[in-house]
A protein has these predicted regions:
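Membrane-interfacial amphipathic/re-entrant helices at transmembrane-helix boundaries
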Residues: 1-21, 50, 61-64, 90-95, ...
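Hydrophobic core segments of alpha-helical transmembrane domains in multi-pass membrane transport
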Residues: 48-53, 69-75, 102-109, 147-156, ...
Length: 291
């Protein structure tokens, strides 16, 4: 029983960390613009697919991984500059619809370019599992967890110890006041999209050796990342990561102990529960009406 529980726990924490990275991407853009970016899932897909493409093209793995983060970050910037900035001041619903359209475009382009097939990426440090109290833990899972911890620490330092980070925080609290004290909020939005896309791509790269990837994986990963952001408290960075871990663990436990047929339904049952009973999330969002 313990071994089985640990196996489900390891699986849930691994995929939950990926949801957490996706949720961080949602949080960054939401804080900067009050927009929920439904193209976030496609950045996860893009990171994994580009990593596969670059490695198959013969590039060393470290170079392939860097490019697979850099390219989606550039795509995120282009999305902000070409689709969001021209309609600055539009209704929030309009901006959300634009991100949905961008999601469809990205998915279609990757389908045409790399096909409909499923692709794999070699694990970063081998595939020999480690035994832990009767359960098995893959080395790639440690990469996912370790990188997620590093990202959380790096973002904490960025937002609390750097001027650029503090400018982004100030904008998230009060955009008008930030502009009045001279903060370039357009630059903040620019950076938010770049960082959000990079975080999504990083999550996709990390999880691809475990779950494989294809042109359409971003839909469900993005939606579950959004669930994680809401569960943790929309606008709360640490809550986004913890929400991702919770969603991943509940999903794995439900699939293991109830039925795998309900695996994808569990996060959406959870978000309905949260919206009805805890609309600000477990750790408190910025305000209940914005959730």
């Amino acid at each position: 029983m313990l071994a089985q529980f640990l196996q489900f726990l390891f699986s849930g924490v691994t995929v939950g960390a990926t949801y957490g990275l996706a949720a961080l991407g949602f949080t960054l853009i939401y804080n900067a613009s009050n927009v929920i970016n439904f193209a976030q899932g496609e950045f996860i897909m893009l990171g994994g697919m580009l990593a596969v493409f670059f490695t198959q093209a013969g590039l060393p793995l470290p170079v392939a991984l860097v490019l697979s983060i850099l390219v989606p970050a550039i795509v995120g910037v282009l999305l902000e500059k070409l689709a969001i900035e021209p309609v600055k001041g539009a209704e929030t619903v309009t901006l959300i619809i634009i991100t949905i359209g961008a999601s469809l475009v990205l998915r279609g382009l990757i389908q045409v370019w790399l096909g409909k097939g499923t692709h794999s990426l070699p694990a970063f440090s081998g595939e020999v599992p480690m035994a832990v109290l009767g359960a098995t833990l893959m080395p790639q899972s440690l990469w996912v967890l370790g990188v997620t911890v590093v990202v959380v620490v790096a973002l904490w330092y960025f937002f609390n110890r750097t001027m650029h980070g503090k400018a982004m925080l100030a904008t998230s609290f009060n955009r008008v006041a930030a502009e009045l004290v001279g903060i370039n909020t357009s630059w903040v939005l620019f950076m938010s999209f770049a960082m959000s896309a990079a975080l999504g791509a990083l999550g996709g790269i990390l999880v691809t050796p475990i779950t494989l990837t294809s042109y359409d994986v971003g839909i469900m990963l993005g939606l579950k990342g959004f669930v994680a952001a809401v569960v943790g408290g929309l606008g709360n960075g640490l809550g986004a990561v913890l929400g991702g871990l919770l969603v991943g663990i509940l999903e794995a436990m439900g699939a293991g102990y109830i039925s795998s047929a309900y695996k994808d339904a569990i996060p959406f049952v959870l978000i309905l529960f949260m919206l009805f009973f805890m609309p600000r999330g477990l750790f408190g969002g910025k305000s209940s009406d914005r959730v």
